[in-house]
């Protein structure tokens, strides 16, 4: 009995060594080097790309941002994005929205330049759609060369005619090398028309959990894996031709298909709607500033080098700082407007104006 027990134990040992039952397979998987997310030096990056306040500068040099979004149902999102850009330090902020949304958005703030140019299907006859689509594009293109960055998607909605018009606007922005930050329903549009951004290095996608899931399913044909989150994000960014993706989460993960950076600055446990809109405006401003600095000075002696990645890191960091500060004051009653009001102080704490 003892001998047979010893033999049995030895057989068990050999089975474990050979990997039956999956133990050696698990060891093998663990031994494979995985892509690791590098914690970004976010505050130093933010300082490096934020322009100084100089009396010699004129209106517009600190950034001109345009938000493409806003329809009958959704007027808050484009306002949050556009006003956040101004609160951070952009000089001018435009909103291109539908005619129904324009009076509402204008009433929120006189600081925004609101263009009631977009149309939805219900207000356009079938025989007029082509002519109106061309007219919308012509009117928006008149402004395009003035902008340092577009934000596409906040409050856009999913009306087919409206999305078709926005697709043409995005194509023209790409031809003009205007950076594009894509959020909200802009991500719905892009997920179904990847060619709009595929291979465009000045595009930034800012998906939340569900938007990211749809992108992964569409591009990688698999489910989201949290254990290999950095590796999967890297593959996704590569799969869309090197666009920059800011995956929102407990820590924001950012990749352009070359590296993966994380921003783990503590934000807020309060998940009120509209925070993604603040982030899109924030990323747009910092992307514009990073690009301006790189064009003017060349190597900024910071890493990473890509303006889209730098802008995403800085935008994420500031948004998180502001959310944390707002939560300290308002706790459970924290709203998006409270976070917006903390953007200026949060930036001042990191990068004091001189």
UniProtKB/Swiss-Prot annotation:
GO function terms (MF aspect): ATP binding; ATP-dependent NAD(P)H-hydrate dehydratase activity
Record-annotated YjeF C-terminal domain positions: 42-350
Catalyses which reaction(s): (6S)-NADHX + ATP = ADP + phosphate + NADH + H(+); (6S)-NADPHX + ATP = ADP + phosphate + NADPH + H(+)
InterPro entries linked to this entry: CARKD, Ribokinase-like
SUPFAM superfamilies found in the cross-reference section: Ribokinase-like (SSF53613)
Binding-site residues, ATP: 248-252, 267-276
EC number from the UniProt entry: 4.2.1.93
Gene Ontology biological-process entries: metabolite repair; nicotinamide nucleotide metabolic process
Keywords noted in UniProt: ATP-binding, Lyase, NAD, NADP, Nucleotide-binding, Phosphoprotein
Pfam families reported for this sequence: Carb_kinase
Positions of (6S)-NADPHX binding: 155, 208-214, 277
Cofactor(s) needed: Mg(2+)
Uppermost EC category: lyase
Record function comment: Catalyzes the dehydration of the S-form of NAD(P)HX at the expense of ATP, which is converted to ADP. Together with NAD(P)HX epimerase, which catalyzes the epimerization of the S- and R-forms, the enzyme allows the repair of both epimers of NAD(P)HX, a damaged form of NAD(P)H that is a result of enzymatic or heat-dependent hydration.
Protein family per UniProt: Belongs to the NnrD/CARKD family.
HAMAP family associated with the record: NADHX_dehydratase (MF_01965)
Protein name, per record: ATP-dependent (S)-NAD(P)H-hydrate dehydratase
Organism the protein comes from: Vitis vinifera (Grape)
């Amino acid at each position: 009995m003892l001998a047979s027990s010893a033999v049995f134990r030895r057989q068990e040992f050999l089975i474990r060594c050979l990997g039956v039952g999956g133990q050696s397979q698990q060891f093998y998987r663990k031994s494979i080097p995985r892509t690791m997310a590098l914690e970004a030096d976010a505050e130093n990056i933010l300082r490096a790309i934020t322009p100084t306040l100089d009396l010699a500068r004129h209106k517009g040099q600190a950034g001109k941002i345009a938000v493409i979004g806003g329809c009958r149902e959704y007027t808050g999102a484009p306002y949050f994005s556009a006003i956040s850009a101004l609160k951070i330090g952009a000089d001018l902020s435009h909103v291109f929205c539908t005619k129904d949304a324009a009076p509402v958005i204008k009433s929120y703030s006189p600081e925004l330049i609101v263009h009631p140019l977009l149309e939805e299907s219900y207000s356009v006859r079938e025989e007029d759609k082509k002519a109106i689509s061309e007219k919308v594009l012509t009117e928006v293109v008149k402004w395009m060369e003035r902008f340092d960055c577009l934000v596409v998607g906040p409050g856009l909605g999913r009306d087919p005619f409206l999305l078709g018009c926005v697709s043409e606007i995005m194509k023209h922005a790409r031809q003009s090398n205007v950076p594009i930050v894509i959020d909200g329903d802009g991500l719905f549009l892009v997920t179904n028309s990847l060619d709009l951004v595929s291979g465009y290095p000045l595009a930034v996608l800012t998906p939340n959990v569900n938007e990211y899931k749809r992108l992964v399913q569409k591009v990688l044909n698999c489910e989201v894996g949290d254990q290999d989150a950095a590796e999967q994000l890297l593959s996704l960014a590569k799969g869309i031709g090197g666009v920059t993706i800011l995956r929102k989460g407990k820590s924001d993960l950012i990749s352009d298909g070359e590296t993966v950076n994380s921003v783990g600055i503590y934000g807020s446990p309060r998940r009120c709607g509209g925070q993604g809109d603040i982030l899109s405006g924030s990323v747009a401003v910092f992307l514009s500033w990073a690009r301006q600095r790189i064009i003017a000075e060349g190597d900024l002696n910071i890493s990473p080098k890509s303006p889209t990645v730098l802008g995403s890191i800085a935008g994420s960091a500031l948004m998180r700082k502001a959310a944390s500060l707002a939560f300290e004051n308002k706790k459970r009653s924290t709203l998006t407007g409270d976070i917006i009001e903390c953007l200026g102080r949060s930036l001042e704490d990191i990068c004091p104006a001189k």
